[in-house]
């Protein structure tokens, strides 16, 4: 069975729409991660002001997010940690993720791959 020109055109249109939607989802995932990271930072600052130990301040933000979004605390914690890493160590990756040029899986892979790379080398690799 051969595809007609119309079938090929329709398939290409569907693939292009999939690319657009995939990019839009990435933008929303980046925004969600940024909001989770912002809540963590807010809670951490509040708790440090109240005298909570530096090591534990902000820990419960992942629980709060998990309850609010009906997701596991671990999932929220992973997104918060990714957000902190991208903010602090991988700004080009964060920018690409926020623009929808890469998705969550790619942002996570870049972050993990560059985790133990020295700062001066990481900036060039990123």
Give the ranges of each region predicted by the language model:
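Peripheral, non-cofactor segments flanking catalytic/redox cores
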Residues: 1-126
